[in-house]
């Protein structure tokens, strides 16, 4: 996925109120940008970090610049949480998830469960319906090991509960973790930051929910899914 807008380098001063960050451009001009990420962004908000911004010439936007990439541990990390669904679709189309081959139709944002929407619903005349939920991942503490979540996520736990119900109905349920960084070879659940999610993950796995993780190559030109990484169920 290539960026539609050219990215501009800057330095991070601080992130605050979740959706905002103060940044400093190369000419030392300081201004506020929007942050398309509702999560904690743990490990990605260090002051003076190298960052990259997209510019949007839209008078309806309050902030013309938007944070897209943060450099952490000499690695470019995508932080825009509106992108993982696009990256997941690209991964499927590029055969990075052969486990999902054979489906004729891919529907987006379909209602299911109790007031929930599934990111993708895959359908076929022969194969069982496949409900595909996408999660964004950026967090790494141990070299080469990506983790999710980076904070408590009641919404994420609820999604696992819904996927368990899908399997109980005789359909396929899949959770796909999109890792917006390249410096990892494995993925695991971050149980110490959200034990409840960890327990629900175990139950979902035992119930037949399928789990996959794909890492991405991140550059100032774009973000591209490149390969699956193994999931380690560490307890």
Curated annotation (Swiss-Prot):
One of its GO terms (molecular function) is DNA binding. InterPro entries: SfsA, SfsA_C, SfsA_N. Transmembrane segments: none annotated. It comes from the Bacteria. Gene3D superfamilies: 2.40.50.580, 3.40.1350.60. NCBIfam families: sfsA. Belongs to the SfsA family. This is Sugar fermentation stimulation protein homolog. It comes from Bartonella henselae (strain ATCC 49882 / DSM 28221 / CCUG 30454 / Houston 1). The gene is sfsA.
């Amino acid at each position: 996925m290539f960026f539609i807008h050219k990215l501009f380098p800057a330095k991070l001063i601080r992130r605050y109120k979740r959706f905002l960050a103060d940044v400093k451009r190369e000419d030392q001009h300081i201004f506020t940008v929007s942050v398309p990420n509702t999560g904690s962004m743990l490990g990605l908000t260090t002051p003076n970090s190298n960052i990259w911004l997209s510019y949007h010439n839209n008078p309806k936007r309050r902030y013309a610049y938007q944070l897209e990439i943060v450099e952490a541990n000499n690695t470019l990390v995508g932080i825009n949480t509106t992108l993982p669904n696009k990256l997941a679709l690209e991964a499927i189309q590029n055969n990075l998830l052969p486990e999902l081959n054979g489906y004729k139709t891919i529907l987006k944002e379909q209602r299911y469960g109790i007031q929930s929407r599934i990111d993708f619903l895959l359908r076929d005349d022969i194969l069982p319906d496949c409900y595909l939920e996408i999660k964004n991942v950026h967090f790494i503490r141990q070299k080469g090991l990506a983790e999710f979540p980076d904070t408590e996520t009641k919404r994420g736990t609820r999604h696992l509960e819904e996927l368990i119900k899908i399997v109980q109905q005789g359909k396929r349920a899949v959770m796909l973790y999109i890792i917006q960084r390249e410096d990892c070879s494995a993925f695991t659940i971050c149980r110490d930051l959200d034990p409840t999610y960890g327990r629900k993950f175990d139950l979902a796995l035992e119930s037949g929910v399928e789990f996959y993780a794909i890492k991405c190559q991140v550059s100032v030109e774009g973000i591209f899914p490149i390969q699956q990484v193994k999931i380690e169920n560490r307890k």
